[in-house]
Amino acid sequence: MAENTVYFPEAFLAQMRAAMPAHLSFDDFIAACQRPLRRSIRVNTLKISVDDFLSLVAPYGWQLAPVPWCAEGFWIEREDDDALPLGSTAEHLSGLFYIQEASSMLPVAALFADNRQPERVMDVAAAPGSKTTQIAARMGNAGGILANEFSASRVKVLHANISRCGISNVALTHFDGRVFGAALPETFDAILLDAPCSGEGVVRKDADALKNWSPESNLDIAATQRELIDSAFHALRPGGTLVYSTCTLNREENQSVIEWLLSRYPQAVEILPLGELFPGAADALTAEGFLHVFPQIYDCEGFFVARLRKTAAIDPLPAPGYKVGKFPFTPLKDREAAAVTAAARAVGLEWDAGHTLWQRDKELWLFPLALEPLFGKVRFSRIGVRLAELHNKGYRWQHEAVIAFAAPQRAFELSQEEAEEWYRGRDVYPQTAPGQDETIVTFQGVPLGLAKRVGSRLKNSYPRELVRDGKLFAGKV
């Protein structure tokens, strides 16, 4: 691969020379920044185990190298990348893996370093969804995740990725992350703040990332980061874990932000060192116990990760002055919920006791039980999964519910040729059609959607916005 021509401001180079640890070479840093970034993926264990995924793609000739800090993560090299983009493969479309930069898998690895299962988690800056989906997989779709995104244009992408991955325990909000400390004090067991930053670590992906860089802008960004981490710390319950991360390399946006939090709450902040997070972590370990990943260490993007514990309650912030408004959903009564559950099971949709049924007009939704205490405290963009729409003849089951709640053992498995037709939005004509009028169709054991039987034809219900043309399969038909 050809090297990048990266733009480096002189002041940035001087800053990096001063910051570079003695055991690292500045020349190696420059050389690493000029190399194209290695592509990486994370297996979505909500849909497939790592071993089964490796067996599935073995015939494709993909070269997969493990990411040391994420058991589900792999660097990937493919000979057929030009003919079939990675994001257009059937395995990606069905949510079997997420295209995620390797270093961005680090914060979630740190969040779950003690192997505890938090009940309630917040991802403060969640789009496009790589870390939210990674958190959901680590939680096994249990508990609840509040995924917030400040940028309105990115909320839609966040939801699309959550839906593709079959995630059902997430609620989306669209706020400035600085509101949560006051709105939801001491609410979450774990919080990830992957803070907006100057992006000094991403030059391998964007050669012009530093075009607008300046020391002054770093200080301005750090001021916002301090406000964000203060809010997040207020929203964290005592005993909870906060992971702060950035994809930048300067001290002002990294160590100094943590030092500021320590000085503000000296009796309530404990640093949890990350030197044992994975074999080789010591190569990026700072004296404080943080991970400061320069790109030459692991041949990835530059990154910073700190893990903290809140050891005591702190004085609350003033209550927010805004009005949330009336919550637009009502919970289904027991008899109604039983009828919906039975009808869903008849078509192969099943869920556990961690989800509850709610209704808004003619819409039926499944909400994560763990997030119900938050209802009425903040305004949500979306909660859980839309299950169905009511109509005169019963229920119109929604695509996202099929992806999240299908029981594959009760589904109709398509051949590769039939699956390709399905992804193209076309009806399928199997040799032997299923007996029931509505059936979940799968490929590789993974749900693709809900089909209606019309004679010998399976009528396609794949959402129009998801329909794909072109090559979809890496293996031979």
UniProtKB/Swiss-Prot annotation:
Pfam families: Methyltr_RsmB-F, Methyltr_RsmF_N, Methyltranf_PUA, YebU_pre-PUA_dom
PROSITE patterns registered for this protein in UniProt: NOL1_NOP2_SUN, SAM_MT_RSMB_NOP
Enzyme superclass (EC): transferase
UniProt GO MF annotations: RNA binding; rRNA (cytosine-C5-)-methyltransferase activity
Tree of life domain: Bacteria
UniProt subcellular location: Cytoplasm
One term under GO cellular component: cytoplasm
Keyword S-adenosyl-L-methionine found: yes
Keyword terms of this UniProt record: Cytoplasm, Methyltransferase, RNA-binding, rRNA processing, S-adenosyl-L-methionine, Transferase
GO biological process: rRNA base methylation
Stretches of the chain forming a coiled coil according to its record: none
Active site, UniProt feature: 247 (nucleophile)
Residues annotated for S-adenosyl-L-methionine binding in this entry: 125-131, 149, 176, 194
EC number: 2.1.1.178
Disulfide bonds: none
InterPro entries for the chain: Methyltr_RsmF_N, MeTrfase_RsmB-F_NOP2_cat, MeTrfase_RsmB-F_NOP2_dom, Nol1_Nop2_Fmu_2, Nop2p, RCMT, rRNA_ssu_MeTfrase_F, RsmB/NOL1/NOP2-like_CS
Swiss-Prot/TrEMBL catalytic activity: cytidine(1407) in 16S rRNA + S-adenosyl-L-methionine = 5-methylcytidine(1407) in 16S rRNA + S-adenosyl-L-homocysteine + H(+)
Family classification: Belongs to the class I-like SAM-binding methyltransferase superfamily. RsmB/NOP family.
HAMAP family referenced in this protein's UniProt entry, alphabetically: 16SrRNA_methyltr_F
Purpose: Specifically methylates the cytosine at position 1407 (m5C1407) of 16S rRNA.
Xref: NCBIfam families: nop2p, PRK11933.1
Name of the protein in question: Ribosomal RNA small subunit methyltransferase F
Organism, scientific name: Klebsiella pneumoniae subsp. pneumoniae (strain ATCC 700721 / MGH 78578)
